[in-house]
Regions:
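Non-heme Fe(II)-dependent double-stranded beta-helix
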Residues: 1-78, 83-87, 124
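Short, surface-exposed loop/helix-turn segments at secondary-structure junctions
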Residues: 9-14, 80, 129-146, 174-176, ...
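Non-heme Fe(II)/2-oxoglutarate
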Residues: 9-15, 157-159, 163-194
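Aromatic-acidic/polar surface patches that form glycan- and anion
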Residues: 35-42, 88, 144-153, 173
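Short acidic/polar capping segments at secondary-structure boundaries
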Residues: 65-72, 82-83, 90-91, 99-104, ...
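Residues that flank catalytic or metal-binding motifs in active/ligand-binding sites
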Residues: 33, 61, 91, 105-107, ...
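Short, conserved beta-strand element in jelly-roll/cupin
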Residues: 79, 86-104, 151-154, 159, ...
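Double-stranded beta-helix
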Residues: 102-169, 189
């Protein structure tokens, strides 16, 4: 998706922007004010993959940076993205691109393979202050023995459906773990809940 040098350059651009406007962690619609986020989200090779998954009529729904600071207890609990968005259809795919190394130590993503085929799972409210998931919910009925780690080098990406169960552990490394999270929808999809 661009390689290590490109990812490091994009990470530097993101950090320069952070110095000017503050934290970009989970700041919605980053592609509307950062050229580098737009360029990564709209790369031809990325859009070709997205087209193979949801068809040729693609809407760039959202772009956020997911940042875990070093030596942090922050984690993301098991969840499904589509639970929160109130969309008419589930023709959706998310790309998570590493801008820094995403290792087990730095809290790379974990997924439950084929879990998207089970549809929506029950989410429960959590009061865990170290859970950085904005909605504060978690799926508790997850068989973690079936989870796979998704380590990535800078510039590599994973793609997952919005019903895929996924989570990530704390970053116990000495470096920031930075990823670009991009959601794509088929254009026939519309918002049904706000």
């Amino acid at each position: 998706m661009g390689g290590d040098d490109t990812a490091k350059g994009r990470q530097l651009q993101m950090e320069v922007a952070e110095n000017k406007i503050g934290s970009l962690h989970y700041l919605s619609k980053a592609h509307t004010f950062l050229t580098s986020a737009w360029e990564l989200a709209s790369k031809a090779e990325v859009l070709d993959l997205v087209e193979n998954l949801i068809g040729p009529d693609i809407l760039l729904y959202n772009v956020t940076y997911i940042i875990k600071e070093p030596n942090s207890l922050s984690h993301v609990s098991w969840h499904q993205d589509l639970t929160y968005w109130g969309l008419s259809h589930d023709d959706q795919v998310s790309m998570w691109m590493a801008l820094s190394p995403a290792t087990k130590e730095s809290g790379c993503m974990r997924m439950i393979p084929r879990s998207h085929k089970q549809g929506r799972q029950k989410h429960e409210v959590t009061t865990d202050k170290t859970n950085v998931l904005l909605q504060g919910q978690t799926v508790t009925s997850v068989d973690e023995d079936t989870a796979v780690f998704c380590p990535l080098n800078p510039g590599q990406a994973t793609f997952h459906h919005g019903w895929t169960l996924h989570a990530s552990m704390p970053n116990i490394s000495s470096e920031r773990r930075i990823g670009l999270n991009v959601q794509y929808l088929a254009t026939h999809t519309h918002q049904t809940k706000h």
